[in-house]
């Protein structure tokens, strides 16, 4: 379930690995001298990961999922998290499992009936977060955590990422919980990289991810006659749908009284009066189904959570 992570290998508590060995695996690294605190940081890339080495620590930052799979559309499982951390250790020549985790993005995709943006209006208030729709995504922000819902296929295409065959023709709703800092506080434990694939910690992370989603207010859906119409509405269908919705809301009896008043005032003749009575009666008998759009996502998110337990 992890995507972007930030790891810190602190030399105060761990023996520094040979700098030359670590840097030999990095592409096009650069050196930055900071004279005010007498540090020199050398930074390069290991595949998609950014790796920085200075006289105090090694920092690893980037998508662990993309490092392991070559893309971050697939979900990183507990086992694949272990494999990715071990691969990093073998490559860089030190035990990456001993790194402190200072950031972890917890995420997965669910395949939905509609494009993801259809579901955003049904996700409402969340205490102590600022809700912010932005460029086809929905953000919830606070100082140490961030939630984002977005269209993962659209995001991958925009970044020129290769989309796995099984996802090419799907609508992928992405729910991502970003633990930006204070990770130890959020999980009530010191979190090392090796803990990310520990069963107890992995379950705890999944529980936090799920609880955060369930804490979001789910806005009630209005009864919507348009959901009874065809998937693609032409002008005639739309006109009929809106008329039917209005009749349901005003009430057939009230419409009868209004039509009768118009007839008595001579504004419509008797023929039109009876024709409209029949037309509105037929429309009033069209069944309305409740559009439980967000229930689909609720169910899918719950299924992901239950699969972790």
Regions found by a protein language model. Name each.
Residues 270-277:
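Helix-turn-helix DNA-binding segment
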Residues 1-254, 286-294, 301-309:
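Structured, helix-rich domain cores that form ligand/interaction pockets
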Residues 259-268:
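Short, aromatic/basic-rich helix-turn unit that serves as a nucleic-acid recognition element
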Residues 278-285:
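Residue-level detection of the helix-turn-helix DNA-binding "recognition helix"
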